[in-house]
Amino acid sequence: MQPKYSQRISSSLGLLLLSALFCSSVWAQRATISDKPDTPFKLATFEAEGKTRLGLALGERILDIAAANAQLTKQAKLPAVAIPGEMRELIEQYARVSPRLYQLANHFKTAKLDGLAFAYALDKIAIKAPIKYPWNMLAAAVNYKSHAQEMGSTNTVNTDNEDPIFFAKSPRSCIIDPGEPFFITPGRNIDWEGELAIIIGKPALNLTLEQAHDHVFGYSIVFDVSDRGGTGRRLNATIPGPNWFHGKSRDRGAPFGPFIVPKEFMPNHANLRIVTKVNGVVKQDASTNMLIFDEAHMIRYLTSILTLHPGDVIVTGTPDGVGTARKPPEYLKPGDEVTIEIEGIGTLKTPMRAATGAKQ
């Protein structure tokens, strides 16, 4: 064989070898980034540098999902996956995008996040309500036995033969961000109610108890601000009983957040500690295992009435310890701060302020 042909063959073999090594390296890198839910994360909507972003929280850091996805796709030579920039759309498309979210969490959990433009410290950004806005926010009334008893009820509930009581809160008027104030109208008796929120993941209608959990996306926190009465015009007495709209639909009456935890990371959702404090003093301390109607029974009932949509919020009820049941009754006042902490989800803080005009 002549030398020049030998050199060409050697050169070609070298290029093939380098190409093979490169491809092996790329595929090895792909293979090492698991697309399984190995690393727990929380989801959030947040604002940083004047822009609203969808975030994936890992410990005390939160990643801008869009930017982190772009970098990992390029760095690891992964197939492109378009991830929605709005929470409700992400929930709707979760089956498609969740493997990439798992890859982001699995990769960046061990990465050095300092200096990465898309990684933010939680205390340096503004967390927003995770969904603005769900189609429905539906809330269970008197759904803890201890709360029913403190409110004067002696009834025994049969969850197999009876339906829960629900009311609606207007998402557009009631939902506010974590840390945003609720404005107290002078003379009104405003009470605290800390509650676990269930986030729906798929369209749901006429579900059985067994089908219910499959249609859940995850869990969050809602402060069900409750108006117990006070000064002002009286409600007419044409129909006896409480006026749920008057008591539960105050403007800004549903602080929501800070995170949504996907259900795969909350296997103990039926046994979570829930604590509500006012100015640091514990007022409510209970577990979600004390619910009268559990997740499945609530979803079965609601979907027998209407269709639930991805991103819809079910507010599951509050335990005992509310202000109106205390002796003497206690109500919130301007300057107070309510904090609601639910195990595994986070802490929702809401300051109380005085309403100073017709426009809050």
Predicted regions and their residues:
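N-terminal non-catalytic cap/leader segment that marks the start of a structured domain
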Residues: 27-160, 359-360
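A generic local secondary-structure boundary/capping motif
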Residues: 31-34, 44, 126-129, 154-156, ...
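Structural signature of FAD isoalloxazine-binding scaffolds in flavoprotein oxidoreductases
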Residues: 155-176, 192, 333-343
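Bacterial N-terminal signal peptides
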Residues: 12-25
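Bacterial N-terminal signal peptides that target proteins for export
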Residues: 2-15
